[in-house]
Amino acid sequence: MISKRRFSLPRLDITGMWVFSLGVWFHIVARLVYSKPWMAFFLAELIAAILVLFGAYQVLDAWIARVSREEREALEARQQAMMEGQQEGGHVSH
């Protein structure tokens, strides 16, 4: 019987990504420091650049989501006010 559930890794937040990357980095650096110190330094710079870009992407993504939610709420409030104004204007009392 074949399972219909696909295997997927959990999505890491930026803190989890930092911890994971530092663990991988320390593991690799432990092997490279004595044999190729320049490669260990290059790897540190590469991982730092990737983490900064990934973190900046997540920060921008959260900011864009917040701004668009606020704009949507403001638009809904304006539409609601316009509908209420039209309903009040349509009712004429004698």
From Swiss-Prot:
Source organism, top-level taxon: Bacteria
List GO terms (cellular component aspect).
Answer: plasma membrane
Location, primary (coarse class)? membrane
Q: Where in the cell is it found?
A: Cell inner membrane
Q: Which InterPro entries match?
A: TraQ_proteobacteria
User: Which keywords does this Swiss-Prot/TrEMBL entry list?
Assistant: Cell inner membrane, Cell membrane, Conjugation, Membrane, Plasmid, Transmembrane, Transmembrane helix
State the membrane topology: Multi-pass membrane protein
Where is the chain membrane-spanning?
14-34, 37-57
Any keyword Membrane?
yes
Per UniProt, subunit arrangement is: Interacts with pilin.
Describe the function of this protein: Required for efficient expression of pilin. Functions as a transient chaperone for propilin, preventing it from being prematurely degraded, and also promotes propilin translocation, positioning it in the membrane for processing to mature pilin.
**What protein is this chain from?**
Protein TraQ
